[in-house]
Swiss-Prot record:
Assigned GO CC terms: cytosol
Subcellular location: Cytoplasm
Binding sites annotated in the UniProt record for S-adenosyl-L-methionine: 19, 21, 46, 71, 94, 117
Enzyme Commission identifier(s): 2.1.1.182
Organism name: Burkholderia multivorans (strain ATCC 17616 / 249)
Gene symbol of the encoding locus: rsmA
Superkingdom in the source lineage: Bacteria
InterPro entries named in the record: KsgA/Erm (IPR001737), rRNA_Ade_diMease-like_C (IPR023165), rRNA_Ade_methylase_Trfase_N (IPR020598), rRNA_adenine_dimethylase (IPR011530), SAM-dependent_MTases_sf (IPR029063)
Protein's UniProt name: Ribosomal RNA small subunit methyltransferase A
rRNA processing as UniProt keyword: yes
Pfam family membership, one: RrnaAD
Length: 275
């Protein structure tokens, strides 16, 4: 595979994190995993040159229910419009600022499927942005840097377990599905990639916790991950009775389960509400 940044007459732009998927075997596997069906509401983040876009459109899009796509590169937008016409509804702009709720069906039921080969340079911020729309999402299938996927699905007690693990596992059921080598892209990235499936928990399955407070606790815990929690969470000792929770502060952040972090955030909420 060539290391050239040019593919199909387009130069991949580093500032957009562009690495175009070109391996048709991998593309077929991804589409089979997504299993798109006619009439579904689906949005692709970063369609690029349309490697995934084309088979997705073939399986689900009609002029009445097009595939939606969010793309920042205006050169690519022009090419995609010319190629797919009314079957692709393009939204020009940054996915980090896009209101994905605007594409969901009216009502409370989840209706939106989200897919994409996400730019690796913004993957974590984008995943956190998408969390705010999880209540209208059926599922998400993303190509990401393998290291990020490993952190997303990591178990407590492992080095990969992180703030990202806790916050995403609180909101989604996640599975790593397919490993994708660098040579599947043009230009090849310097890292391995993987496909992850993310299915939001239904409202009745979610713990009753303020995600902002959960994020506050988890961020503090992982702020110095090699230190014990009695140091990183020490400022909360005056407001949270850790002993009553059965929460051992003589551990590191990576050794605490998602459920335990939720319990601490709930205790913090109860204390602050009582003040």
């Amino acid at each position: 595979m060539s290391n050239s940044r040019q593919h199909q007459g387009h130069f991949a732009r580093k500032r957009f994190g562009q690495n175009f998927l070109v391996d048709h075997g991998v593309i077929d596997s991804i589409v089979a995993t997504i299993a798109p069906a006619r009439g579904q509401r689906m949005v692709e983040i970063g369609p690029g040159l349309g490697a995934l876009t084309e088979p997705l459109i073939a399986r689900l899009a009609t002029p009445e229910t097009p595939l939606h796509a969010v793309e920042l590169d205006r050169d690519l937008i022009a090419r995609l419009k010319q190629r797919f016409g009314a079957l692709l509804e393009l939204h020009a702009g940054d996915a980090l600022a896009f209101d994905f709720r605007s594409l969901a069906a009216p009502g409370d039921a989840p209706s939106l499927r989200i897919v994409g080969n996400l730019p690796y340079n913004i993957s974590s911020p984008l995943l956190f942005h998408l969390m705010t729309f999880a209540d209208v999402v059926v599922d998400q299938h993303f190509m990401l840097q393998n290291e990020v996927v490993e952190r997303m699905v990591a178990e407590p007690g492992t080095k990969a377990f992180s703030r990202l693990s806790v916050m995403l596992q609180y909101r989604y059921v996640m599975d790593k599905l397919i490993d994708v080598p660098p040579e599947s892209f043009q230009p090849p990235p310097k890292v391995d990639s993987a496909i992850v499936r993310m299915i939001p928990y239904a409202p009745h399955e979610l713990p009753d916790v303020d995600p902002v407070l959960l994020g506050e606790i988890v961020t503090a815990a992982f702020s110095q991950r090699r230190k014990m929690l009695r140091n990183t969470l020490g400022d909360y000792r005056e407001t949270i009775d850790f002993d009553a929770l059965g929460f051992d502060l003589a551990r590191r952040a990576e050794d605490v389960s998602v459920a335990e972090y939720v319990g601490v955030a709930q205790a913090l909420a109860a204390t602050r509400n009582a003040q």
